[in-house]
Design a protein with these regions (language model features):
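Charged/polar, solvent-exposed surface patches and flexible loops
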Residues: 100, 112-115, 168, 172, ...
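Short loop/turn segments at beta->alpha junctions
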Residues: 90, 211, 272-275
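Short, charged/small-residue-rich alpha-helical element at the C-terminal edge
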Residues: 220-296
Length: 296
C-alpha cells in the first residue's frame, strides 16, 4: 500500500505545491491520479518515489518511510515524464547498471521483452525519438519486476498499438504478481479502461478519492421533461436545457436520484452513466476551476 498522510510541501518559501495531501493506493490496485494543471501530481509522485522530502506529514510504502530508504526504493519502478534522467548511455549499458543496482532485475524477462520493443541496444538513448525513449524506459522498468510501478504521463507520444501492448504488460504484472500501479495522466478515457481506483487533485490537495466503480455510482446524468419544480434535495452540479428537455448532472446514486425525481412527475426521465472525464470536469467545476483550462 502507498500512503501519503497530511503531506505538505512548499518550494521557495512561498509556493505550496502540496497542501495537507492525503492519498491511499490499495495493495494490488491500479490507481489513476488526475487533476488540474499544476495540481501537484508530479510533486506527489516525487514524494512517493523518495526524490523529495516532505515538509510535514508522512509518506510510506508497505508501512515504511520512503525517503532515504534504499530497501523500499528498490521495490519501486518509476518512469518519469522527463526521461532526461536516463542520460546518454545505451540500453545495454543501462541494463547492466540496473542489474547491479536492483537485486530484483530479471534478466530472463529483459531478454523476453526484446521481441516486444525491438530497439537497438547499442545506440545511445539520446539518439532515440521520444517514443523510442519511452519504449526503452518501459523495457528496463518492467524488467525490474517491481512491487510498485509509478508512472507519470507514461504513454504520452506512443502509438495506439504500443500503448495497448504496454498496458497489457503492466496489467499482467498486476494479475500475476500483485503489482501495485499508480499512473498520472491527462488521458482520462484511457485511465477509465485500466484503473480501478481514482484520485482527483486540485491546488495541492485531494478533492476526492475512491474506487472507480463507487465514483461512477455516485454521479448520474439525467435528461428529463417536467412542468413541476425539481426537489430541493437534489445535489445538482450542472444543468442545461434544450427546448423542454433539461439535462442535469447530479451527485448521488442512480436509484436515490430516480426516487427523488419521481416526486416531480416527469413526462420523460432518462438516467445515464457519466464517464470519468465528465465526472472530472463537473467535480472541478464545483471548485471554480475554469473548464476551458482543462487538458484532456
Amino acid at each position: 500500500m502507498i500512503e501519503l498522510s497530511h503531506v505538505t510541501k512548499t518550494f521557495g518559501g512561498a509556493t505550496r505545491a502540496l497542501d495537507d495531501l492525503t492519498l491511499t493506493v490499495p495493495q494490488g490496485a491500479v490507481y489513476g491520479l488526475v487533476g488540474s494543471n499544476g495540481a501537484g501530481k508530479t510533486t506527489a509522485i516525487r514524494h512517493i518515489t523518495g526524490i523529495f522530502r516532505q515538509d510535514s506529514g508522512s509518506v510510506t510504502i508497505g508501512g515504511l518511510p520512503v525517503y532515504e530508504n534504499p530497501a523500499v526504493k528498490s521495490r519501486i519502478g518509476y518512469i518519469p515524464d522527463d526521461l532526461g534522467v536516463f542520460g546518454g548511455g545505451t540500453l545495454r549499458e543501462l541494463a547492466a547498471f540496473y542489474r547491479t543496482m536492483y537485486p530484483r532485475f530479471d534478466a530472463k524477462r529483459y531478454a523476453a521483452l526484446r521481441d516486444v520493443f525491438r530497439l537497438d541496444e547499442a545506440t545511445p538513448l539520446r539518439r532515440f525519438s521520444k517514443g523510442m525513449q519511452k519504449h526503452a524506459a518501459f523495457w528496463l522498468t518492467l524488467s525490474l519486476r517491481p512491487d510498485y510501478l509509478v508512472l507519470d504521463e507514461p504513454v504520452d507520444g506512443l502509438d495506439p498499438v504500443m500503448r495497448r501492448q504496454i498496458w497489457s504488460l503492466a496489467l499482467e504484472d498486476v494479475a500475476g504478481y500483485g503489482t501495485t500501479v499508480l499512473v498520472s495522466s491527462h488521458n482520462l478515457r484511457e485511465l477509465e479502461d485500466i484503473c480501478d481506483h481514482v484520485g482527483i487533485m486540485h491546488m495541492g490537495h485531494m478533492l476526492l478519492e475512491r474506487s472507480l466503480s463507487d465514483l461512477q455510482d455516485n454521479f448520474v446524468k439525467v435528461q428529463l421533461v417536467t412542468e413541476n419544480p425539481l426537489p430541493q434535495s437534489l445535489q445538482i452540479l450542472h444543468e442545461s436545457a434544450l427546448g423542454r428537455v433539461q439535462t442535469l448532472i447530479l451527485r448521488g446514486d442512480p436509484q436515490t436520484v430516480a426516487d427523488e425525481l419521481a416526486a416531480s412527475a416527469p413526462m420523460l426521465c432518462d438516467l445515464l452513466p457519466l464517464s470519468l472525464e465528465e465526472i472530472f470536469i463537473y467535480e472541478l467545476g464545483g471548485t471554480g476551476y475554469d473548464v476551458k483550462n482543462l487538458v484532456l
